[in-house]
Design a protein with these regions (language model features):
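N-terminal Rossmann-like FAD-binding beta1-loop-alpha1 element of flavoenzymes
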Residues: 7-33, 186-194
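Conserved hydrophobic packing residues within short motifs/helices of P-loop NTPase cores
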Residues: 9-11, 32, 142, 178, ...
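Glycine-centered short loops/turns at secondary-structure junctions
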Residues: 28, 197-199, 229
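Short beta-strands and strand-loop turn motifs
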Residues: 83, 202-206, 233-235
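Rossmann-like NAD(P)H-binding beta-loop-alpha module
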Residues: 171-213
Length: 240
């Protein structure tokens, strides 16, 4: 088998792709994984992991500022260093990316950075910074993941209308923030920035936050969010 011939070529290096790559390699296959952007995918780089890091940091800030005095703990003036908070988040991401690189190295998985395209049966073209390579594959697995959904009446402009990706990397705390969508991602972002001082309004088209969740639990969560300063407007839509 040549250097560019593989038993399995996986397009996408997110949680589905990199786990499949390691497992296939354990089973004796020669494996390549292709991704145009992030090793670890959206979840690790601009989704689940950084959002949880900011949720933890913002919770500690919120408790230090508003909650510890009830326990007889006085800290004086509590200052927010958003740059340091974001730096911690990035360090966590970097550490986990290094872990995946180590996983690939330990399992002898070849990693190609570029856009992977299935050009014909058993052929994957990888367009990277150094040109195009064509990988031969007995099997091809598509694990391309997802991207933030853009609403027709609220197109992303990177400034006033942003996706969760930008919301995880803001350089200053916005004075006001409208979150369109009361699902898990929207509520996480709203909670983070409300704890850090933003006036947050969550707009949800359905009649409860977290549609599909037990209604009583969703109601309890709504009350907790309200105490943190997050207002939820249900049965409503938004437009610029």
């Amino acid at each position: 088998m040549s250097d560019l011939s593989f038993d399995l070529v996986i397009i996408g290096a997110g949680p589905g792709g990199y786990v499949a790559a390691a497992k296939a390699a354990e089973l004796g296959m020669k494996v390549a994984c292709v991704d145009k952007s992030y090793l670890g995918g959206t979840c690790l780089n601009v989704g689940c992991i950084p959002s949880k890091a900011l949720l933890e940091s913002s919770e500690l800030y919120y408790k230090a500022k508003k909650g510890l005095d009830r326990h007889g703990i006085g800290l004086g003036e509590v200052a927010l260093d958003l740059g340091a908070m974001m730096g911690r988040k990035e360090k966590i991401v970097e550490t986990m990316v290094k872990g995946i690189k180590g996983l690939f190295k330990g399992h002898d998985v070849s990693y190609f950075v570029g856009t992977g395209t299935v050009v014909e049966a058993g052929k994957v073209a990888v367009a990277g910074a150094d040109g195009e390579q064509v990988l031969a594959a007995k099997h091809i697995l598509l694990a391309t993941g997802s991207a933030p959904a853009e609403l027709p009446n609220l197109p992303f402009d990177g400034e006033r209308v942003i996706s969760s990706t930008e919301a995880l990397a803001l350089q200053e705390v916005p004075e006001r923030l409208v979150v369109v969508g009361g699902g898990a991602i929207g509520l996480e972002m709203g909670s983070v920035w409300a704890r850090l001082g933003s006036e947050v309004l969550v707009v949800e088209l359905m009649d409860q936050i977290l549609p599909g969740m037990d209604r009583e639990m969703a109601g309890q969560l709504g009350r907790l969010l309200k105490r943190q300063g997050v207002e939820c407007r249900l049965g409503a839509s938004a437009q610029v």
